Amino acid sequence: ITPLFLKGEVAGKKVGDQGTAPHKVLYLEAEKSKVFAKSPTQFMSLIPTVYNADTLGIRPDLIKRPIESWAELLNPEFKGKTAILNIPSIGIMDAAMVVEAKGIHKYKDKGNMTKAEIDLTIKTLIEAKKAGQFRALWKDFNESVNLMSSGEVVIQSMWSPAVTAVRSKGIACTFQPLKGGYRAWAAGFGLPTTMLIDAQGCELG
């Protein structure tokens, strides 16, 4: 299992652990416990399966200058040519990266916002939308690919496979590293304690 899940490290270096960082919710204090352990135990809450980190995708051939900050998503220079992910639980994280990069607010923990922070983040998005900043709010992989491929959008929330899909069309597209870092995510597989299993390991009923 990768050290990212076990210790919150990549290549021996600690990574940001705001929100539900895998290593903070991986271990349980006991077999039937509902309390996460602060150090490794023999009881795991799930089996880690996949992780990645997302950032902004850009069309360097159309932007023609360096992009180094999440704040560029709300730069008036790109009015009407930006897009953000429209899956609330993920999109608000991208929005928070933008809010922090613009110096509007510094979050203690983007993954555990206060009500006031949620309100501020949503208010920032609403104002940008009303001002015509966004070409679209996408929630489908293919939609993000089409927006970028067509040139309707030059900078947007993007997943790495979508960037690859745009490149496969012979179109310049960059999965852009930013000073504010990436928005990371992880997933795992777990079985509910209510599941009935027979001696052969098959689910009953």
What are these regions (language model features)?
Residues 1-143:
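Extracytoplasmic ligand-binding site segments that recognize negatively charged/polar headgroups
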Residues 5, 146-151:
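Hydrophobic residues within well-ordered alpha-helices
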Residues 74, 126, 148-150, 167-168:
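Alpha-helix boundary recognition
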Residues 78-81, 150-155:
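Alpha-to-beta junction loops
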Residues 84, 157-158:
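Short beta-strand and adjacent tight-turn residues that come in two discontinuous sequence segments
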Residues 142-145, 178-179:
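Short, solvent-exposed loop/turn elements at beta->coil junctions and helix N-caps
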Residues 144-147, 163:
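Short, hydrophobic alpha-helical packing/hinge segments within bilobed ligand-binding/sensory domains
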Residues 158, 162, 167-205:
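Extracytoplasmic/periplasmic substrate-recognition and gating elements
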